[in-house]
């Protein structure tokens, strides 16, 4: 490794905090942390520090929480730190050119996809939702575009049918942190070898909206199971029965192209193995759900309790 770098770290959620923790265990020096301002959180809506700020405070690292980086004052504050590089992981603020140009080696970003596929805010969700078989992390030198910078390093990992956004995020956090450190260890050489992103294969991972969480039972079994996994743990998919919302947390495919005469959304059967529901092209087995005002339960637990709302013949709605 070359001489340890003076690093400014910019990030906000737990995913970024994992990267910061790994960076603090490396030979590189974290001289300051940038993160989003404290936000109201929890039932009491108390101002709460971001996970990244919490890690920084534990290590007595200076924390900056600007509302914007577009002022001359913010540029001057960053210049005063004399950083070699700025590492950005799910920060949440746009970096103008005046900021990108301050560090000696520029700003690098850890993005949770194999660019140029899934540029944007929700790459992990969208990869699962689309049925991708593979994803990973891309380390890029940032420019003024949306995840358009030259690529320094890529690390890949498979997506299985058991992955949710929650579990895959945890795996990519570990992979991303390891890849970040190895990138910083060889940064000058990697910058010289940086590769432009290909023009082919560009897709955008738009932010998840709450409206997307409502299951459309006319969709294919594959699309529905992928969506349930993609929106777990947040915001969580739901369906409607008797005017009430039922959250769907886990589901598996019963069969592709299974023949059924029941309308999409119809409950076919219920036993301890699963709740069988018709879809646009077959059947799906819901194995974990959450009834109104209840905690999430396995279907076996529901069968042992009060399964009345889930009687065969009832039909889930696709509209509020």
Protein language model regions, located:
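N-terminal Rossmann-like dinucleotide-binding module
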Residues: 1-43
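Internal alpha/beta domain cores that form substrate/cofactor-binding pockets in large enzymes
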Residues: 6-8, 29-33, 62-81, 86, ...
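Structural motif corresponding to alpha-helix initiation and N-cap regions
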Residues: 17, 46-49, 71-75, 93, ...
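Amphipathic, non-transmembrane alpha-helical secondary structure
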Residues: 17, 21-25, 76-79, 97, ...
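Donor/substrate-binding cores of folate-linked one-carbon enzymes
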Residues: 26, 36, 85-204, 209-211
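N-terminal beta-loop-helix "entrance" segment that forms/cooperates
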Residues: 39-57
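An anion-binding loop in the catalytic cleft
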Residues: 218-320
């Amino acid at each position: 490794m070359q001489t340890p770098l003076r690093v400014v770290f910019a990030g906000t959620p737990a995913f970024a905090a994992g990267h910061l923790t790994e960076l603090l265990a490396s030979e590189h020096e974290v001289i300051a942390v940038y993160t989003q301002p404290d936000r109201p959180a929890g039932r009491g809506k108390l101002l709460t520090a971001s996970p990244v700020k919490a890690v920084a405070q534990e290590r007595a690292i200076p924390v900056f929480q600007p509302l914007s980086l577009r002022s001359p004052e913010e540029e001057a504050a960053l210049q005063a730190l004399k950083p070699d590089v700025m590492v950005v992981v799910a920060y949440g603020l746009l970096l103008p050119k005046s900021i990108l140009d301050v560090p000696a080696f520029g700003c690098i970003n850890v993005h949770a996809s194999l660019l140029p596929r899934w540029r944007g805010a929700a790459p992990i969700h969208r990869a699962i939702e689309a049925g991708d078989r593979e994803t990973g992390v891309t380390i890029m030198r940032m420019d003024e575009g949306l995840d358009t910078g030259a690529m320094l390093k890529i690390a890949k990992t498979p997506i299985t049918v058991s992955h949710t956004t929650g579990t895959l995020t945890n795996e990519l956090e570990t992979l991303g942190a390891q890849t970040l450190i190895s990138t910083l260890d060889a940064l000058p050489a990697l910058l010289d070898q940086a590769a432009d992103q290909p023009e082919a294969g560009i897709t955008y991972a738009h932010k998840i909206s709450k409206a997307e969480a409502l299951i459309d039972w006319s969709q294919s079994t594959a699309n529905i199971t992928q969506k349930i996994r993609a929106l777990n743990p947040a915001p969580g998919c739901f369906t409607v029965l008797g005017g009430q919302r039922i959250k769907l947390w886990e589901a598996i495919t019963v069969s592709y192209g299974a023949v059924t005469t029941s309308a999409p959304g119809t409950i076919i059967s219920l036993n301890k193995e699963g709740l069988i529901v018709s879809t646009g092209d077959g059947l799906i087995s819901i194995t974990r759900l959450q009834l109104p005002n209840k905690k999430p339960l396995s279907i076996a637990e529901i069968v042992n309790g009060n399964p009345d709302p889930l009687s065969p013949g009832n039909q889930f709605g696709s509209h509020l």
